[in-house]
Amino acid sequence: IHTTADFEYADLIEFMNDAINSGKEALKNGCKIYCDTNMIVNGASKMVLSKFNCEAYCLVADSEVVKEAKEKGVTRSIVGMEKAAKDPNTKIFLIGNAPTALYQLKEMIERNEIEKPALVVGVPVGFVGAAESKETFKSLGIPYITINGRKGGSTVAVSILHGILYQMYQ
């Protein structure tokens, strides 16, 4: 609510499958956090993450990701997610922009291509696919935090991460 100045978020946010505790456990053990935008990476508190030996990263601008996405005719968000999700040290996923990243992660989990994440913050914003991607992810039974409907965004994803870190850092 503080990040958006929108009180409706109190009714839209949803926490599933012990998301907070699962996220805290992954952070305590030091993990990588994949972000679908560099804006999330830049917003995440590197100082606090370093206290837990955690690192936030994004691959959408990676030259190999750009090349592969072009060759396959898909978005960089899809290819970035494919690569990040296969890294066994990536336990948390913050998705604030690209519904395609959330769909890709869901498909990989359903096909048992990857270990189930410790936490997914799925809050892509927008009119095309955002609400649907967030809704379909709920069926997986994994620790998940979302904002129902079209609202969300990179700043919301960062604020959710910071909320969890704040609880741990007190």
Regions found by a protein language model. Name each.
Residues T37-R111, A118, G126, K134:
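Conserved mixed alpha/beta catalytic, RNA-binding, or beta-rich assembly cores of soluble enzyme
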Residues H2-D11, V66-E68, L119:
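Short, basic, glycine/proline-bearing loop/turn elements
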Residues A5-Y9, E25-K32, L49-S50, K86-N89, ...:
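Generic secondary-structure signature for well-ordered alpha-helical cores
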Residues D36, V120-G122, I160:
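Buried hydrophobic positions in well-ordered alpha/beta secondary-structure cores of metabolic enzymes
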Residues V128-Q170:
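C-terminal functional extensions of proteins
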Residues D11-L12, G43-M47, A157:
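Short, glycine/acidic-enriched capping/hinge loops at junctions between secondary-structure elements
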Residues D11-A26:
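A short, well-structured juxtamembrane/interface segment
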Residues V121-V123, T146-I147:
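Thr-Gly-centered strand-to-loop micro-motif
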